[in-house]
Amino acid sequence: MRNGVLRLAGVLAAFTLLSLAVPLPYVEELRTEAEAAQSSACDKNPKPANLNFVLKDAAGKDFNLASQKGKVILLDFWATWCPPCKVEIPWFVEFQEKYGPKGLIVIGVSVDDPASALKPFGEKYKVNYPLLVGDGRNDIKGPRGYNAAWGLPRTFVIGRDGNICKTHVGLSVKEHFEQQIKSLL
């Protein structure tokens, strides 16, 4: 039995050494190309963003998305119960603070939370950008809107020209967001 264990250990060691023989520069080059493609400013065929709607904020005031055209918009569809959303929100707070004066606006649209849940959530996370109520709005949740009901968070990076440059579904990489924002400002 001892010889069998030693043989198995030898085979595993040989396999490990062979797997390290893959040229690391080649693997690194592939990783770098993938990251560059992911973080480029806009997709090849950007589509116009639908900014022609008005949502209520946590205080019940109207917020007209069309009034933000001409800015770089980070439009984030999220929910208070969504763990990946809670990871990204502090990044968005940082982006709003850092890039807001340069023409960025972050807009958070809660897809299934009542207005009463937004204010305490915003205070807890020190949100410095508009939090809007999207609950019950099929025009933004459905396929004719932003498909915000399918996968959260769902974040759109929209250029000054009103075109959707990138769409992120699920937890994304902070650096990708930041690179895209910087390239559009």
Regions found by a protein language model. Give the residues of each.
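Structural microenvironment flanking redox-active thiols in thiol-disulfide oxidoreductases
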Residues: K86-K126, G136-P143
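Conserved hydrophobic/aromatic "anchor" residues
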Residues: F53, Q68, F77-W78, F121, ...
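Rossmann-like NAD(H)/NADP(H) cofactor-binding core
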Residues: L75, I105-I107, P130
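N-terminal targeting signals for export/organelle localization
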Residues: M1-K56
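Short pre-active-site segment immediately N-terminal to redox-active cysteine/selenocysteine motifs
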Residues: K71-I73, F77-W81, E88, G151
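Active-site-proximal beta-strand/loop segments in catalytic clefts of secreted hydrolases
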Residues: F77-W78, V109-D112, G134-D135, V169-L171
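Thiol/disulfide oxidoreductase modules built on the thioredoxin-like
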Residues: E123-N128, G134-K182
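A short beta-strand-turn-helix
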Residues: N52-I73, Q96-Y99, P143
